[in-house]
Regions:
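Short, polar/proline-rich extracytoplasmic segments that appear immediately after membrane translocation
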Residues: 2-73, 180-184, 189-195
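Extracellular adhesion/glycan-binding regions together with long Ser/Thr-
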Residues: 2-3, 123-162
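Surface-exposed interaction patch
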Residues: 25, 30-31, 35-37, 80-131
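Intrinsically disordered, low-complexity boundary segments flanking structured domains
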Residues: 38-44, 49-50, 94-100, 152-157
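A generic structural signal for short beta-strands and their flanking turns/coil linkers
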Residues: 50, 75-77, 106
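Generic structural motif
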Residues: 54-56, 110-112, 164-167
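Short beta-strand segments and strand-loop junctions that repeat across beta-rich extracellular domains
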Residues: 55, 113-116, 146-148
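C-terminal, structured domain-capping segment
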Residues: 70-97, 149-195
């Protein structure tokens, strides 16, 4: 009799274990699906970079090709530079590809003015905006070799802006005989950097 009772207890206990496992599993399943949720979304974000752009109206032709100069010789030419960038910028002028013989550059004065009113190389209608941005020898100008030490005050806003530049050279009236047969050359480079 006691043997039968023990067996029933074991059966009851054994049956209770799987029932408990099933019940706990059901509770976990219900818990995993019982949370409320909500989201909010910011629309797709986009980025694009701005631009700085410069052009000029020289038609890829040097401002000066002056030969057979004598002391006191002088001439002026104008160039118009246009900024069309989407960013505001600062523009500087500096020299490139400089060379001279017989110290001609040391006797050649260069004057550069910023202004407006002229779109032709002959400077018709040019009005200076103020004092010259450079006035010295070509040798001195040759030290201006980058944006960092370039000359100029133009700070165009975004969009299309123009600036005229008048460049005047004059060979010193007291140029010595040692400069005879001399040569000088330099390129003019305008560079814009965003402000």
């Amino acid at each position: 009799m006691s043997f039968i009772n023990i067996t029933r207890k074991q059966l009851v206990a054994g049956a209770a274990v799987p029932v408990a496992v099933i019940a706990s599993g059901a509770m976990v399943w219900q818990a995993s699906y019982s949370a409320f949720s909500a989201t909010t979304t910011n629309p797709t974000n986009n980025w694009s970079s701005g631009t700085v752009e410069l052009t000029d109206n020289d038609a890829n032709t040097a401002l000066f090709t002056a030969t057979n100069l004598k002391p006191g010789a002088t001439a002026a030419r104008c160039i118009t530079v246009t900024s069309t960038g989407s960013l505001a910028s600062t523009v500087k002028l500096y020299g490139t590809d400089y060379a001279t013989t017989n110290n001609l550059a040391g006797n050649l004065n260069l004057k550069v003015e910023e202004g407006s009113g002229s779109t032709s190389a002959d400077c018709a209608g040019f009005t200076a905006a103020g004092a010259a941005i450079f006035d010295g020898t070509l040798t001195a100008f040759s030290s201006k070799t980058s944006f960092a030490n370039g000359v100029g005050t133009w700070a165009p806003a975004a969009g299309t802006q123009t600036k005229s530049y008048r460049v005047t050279y004059a060979l010193n009236a007291a140029t010595p005989d040692s400069a005879q047969g001399g040569t000088a050359k330099v390129g003019f480079t305008w560079e814009a950097q965003n402000s």
